[in-house]
């Protein structure tokens, strides 16, 4: 008997085009990846030192049909097997989002398949459900190029932002510091690698803000790094880039881990989930593991590297919950670059 008598499997097709990855995935029951195809554009944006929205949109137009067909082929299914289509409706670059949203609407209309809109950050959080079943209440530390926030969830589909950045996101600070150190885009992995070769010997600020605040601020730290480099150049002093990278990374991680740990205690959560592109950072992963190893009642979940950066499996995972909760989008669904996760 066993697990095979379960009710019909829920098959969700996920589509993600919020920034510079064109991604389509097929996920079963919100937890099992059947296909996960990602076409990255990093090479196209590298020489500009960041994502160029116009170029990103053009690439999505070129790639979306190919990636969609590849995902269906990899999953060995047809459109008839799909219960719903989940697509990132925001936040992100409006031109990029539009490609995914319109592709999803076209397929939904042509094949009469239900449509679900997904918040990009909800996707990052639900990437963790592809690793392990989530337990509530939980806290998610979301760290990416555009977002740095602590999100409290008391149940599926309920998101309360208890802390967020007041200026730069952590990933943004990484990219800007990398540029100051003449490193290629995206800067995060380069700084992470370099930081492991150096020592955090340079005194850099940590923005703790008010004693009871779970908010973040990285603009002061970013400016301090840039000023340190400029001052050293003016004085003709040599600063070891690996030490600067290590000092910067330690400053960022100190604040992220301390605030996540404090919030986990205050909200009495069962799990802490790491989410977002910067979740791939080895230094951050190691520090979180060390911190939460000391807490007996809190389980830390860290997704594999392939599920940290933008992908569509996470959108399908979040979309499964929305679909099962009866949420549906109409064909009037539009890209919403400023979409609020708490809405």
From Swiss-Prot:
Functional description taken from the UniProt entry: Required for the formation of a threonylcarbamoyl group on adenosine at position 37 (t(6)A37) in tRNAs that read codons beginning with adenine. Is involved in the transfer of the threonylcarbamoyl moiety of threonylcarbamoyl-AMP (TC-AMP) to the N6 group of A37, together with TsaE and TsaB. TsaD likely plays a direct catalytic role in this reaction.
Coiled coil: none
Co-factor binding details: Binds 1 Fe(2+) ion per subunit.
Annotated positions binding Fe cation: 120, 124, 310
Cofactors, names only: Fe(2+)
Keywords per UniProt: Acyltransferase, Cytoplasm, Iron, Metal-binding, Transferase, tRNA processing
Subcellular location, record wording: Cytoplasm
Lineage, top ranks: Bacteria, Bacillati, Bacillota, Bacilli, Bacillales
One of the protein's GO biological processes: tRNA threonylcarbamoyladenosine modification
GO cellular component: cytoplasm
UniProt KW Glycoprotein keyword: no
Residues holding substrate: 142-146, 175, 188, 192, 281
Family the UniProt entry places it in: Belongs to the KAE1 / TsaD family.
NCBIfam families: gcp_kae1, T6A_TsaD_YgjD
GO molecular function, one term: iron ion binding
The name this protein goes by in its record: tRNA N6-adenosine threonylcarbamoyltransferase
Annotated EC: 2.3.1.234
One matching Pfam family: TsaD
Catalytically driven reaction(s): L-threonylcarbamoyladenylate + adenosine(37) in tRNA = N(6)-L-threonylcarbamoyladenosine(37) in tRNA + AMP + H(+)
